[in-house]
Amino acid sequence: MKRLAHFLALAVYCWSCTENPIGVEVPDGSLSSPVAGAKLAARSDIYVVRHGGEEVFRVEALKWRNGHRGVVSVTYDAPWGINEVFSLATDAAIARDLRMDLEIVSSKLEHPQRFHIIERMQRELRPHGIGFFGHGHEHIHYDWYGFEAAYEAFRTNFELMREWGLEPKTYAYPHWAGKLYGTQAANRQAGFIAARGGLRRPESRSEYYICPDDTREPNNWYFMPSVIMGAKNGTDIPHHDALAPILQGALDAGAWVILTYHSIGNPEGWGYYPFAEFERDLDHIAANDFWSGNLDEVTAYIKERNALDIQIVRYFGVGTPKQFELTIGDGLDNALYDEPLTFEFNFNPELRVRWVHFDPPIGDESSFAIEEDRLQVELVPDERRYALVLERDSE
């Protein structure tokens, strides 16, 4: 079989929401490249591969992992390990295979007598999907102290988390600080890629929603809204029945919503929230079409998807090509942005593709059966080159 190798054209016609317009330059002369091309189709995360004017397949990076309708991140501002009452919540999340994130106030853990708590976190929590967010070196209102003090505290928090192997990426401001641009800038310069704030009694529950509908990123990565859970101390959502409409709205809008809890099952603690109500919240999340995602995971997913670039490098075969080589990347730091995206491949039904073989393999799998002309796989957009071999029914 004669082996043909052509560089394919990448012609880009894309639009997205007004918050994040995207434009890609087409190299000179590439529009006249022969017979094949990969181009963006209507949205910046769908790529269509054609040969001789016929669509072979299209690739879409789904908005949320595994095509879920919405996303929930459960964040817990509590000093896990200081008192066993704080394990109630993490045990409940782990029992339901749901993700959850915990605060790290580094001054509370930097003393040698508390190093065993960090060891327990690594051993008992991280393997079960419990993540960690920076919460300051001290638990103070950083808007009150200016840029320099905030930066020093954020950077110390970041560096200690990294030293302890907690892989810092995201942050949450104590006392609902972070409203000042200087505080946000300090957080960004300290190394965090996003930060959670708090939203007190919004006029509309839609203000809680991050990336609703076609919106591609938060209004402000360094002051993301969250739902303030709690039955006392002026907190907003005292029980599950008050939360349920907010969660339903997130599903309807295809949005991400962050929940902030304090003192779950601890009546003496600030912002007490009944444990039975927390269990109802978790059961509701598990029973509905939510991606239960850590702050780090969801943040990286959104940023990688927005920066996605798929290049069809070449193809092989006589007639309609059977093998394609493509690179999937995002141009971001792969040491920091290492979250798999969910890609959906849709094949032209007339081609009757039954198997797709990947080289290198995806995880431990190299061959995937095609059902109803569709395949979903999880890939990190780390600029790796993949060979895809299409096996058709007639072969």
Regions found by a protein language model. Name each.
Residues 1-2, 309:
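Short linear, low-complexity motifs centered on an aromatic residue
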Residues 2-13:
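Sec-dependent signal peptide recognition
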Residues 21-35:
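Short, low-complexity, disordered segments immediately C-terminal to signal peptides
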Residues 32-83, 179-387:
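C-terminal active-site subregion of NodB/CE4 polysaccharide deacetylases
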Residues 70-72, 82, 93-185, 189-228, ...:
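Metal-dependent polysaccharide deacetylase catalytic core of the NodB/CE4 family, i.e.
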Residues 87, 91, 152-155, 159, ...:
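Solvent-exposed, polar/charged alpha-helical surfaces in well-ordered, non-transmembrane soluble domains
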Residues 393-395:
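Short acidic/polar inter-strand loop motif in beta-rich domains
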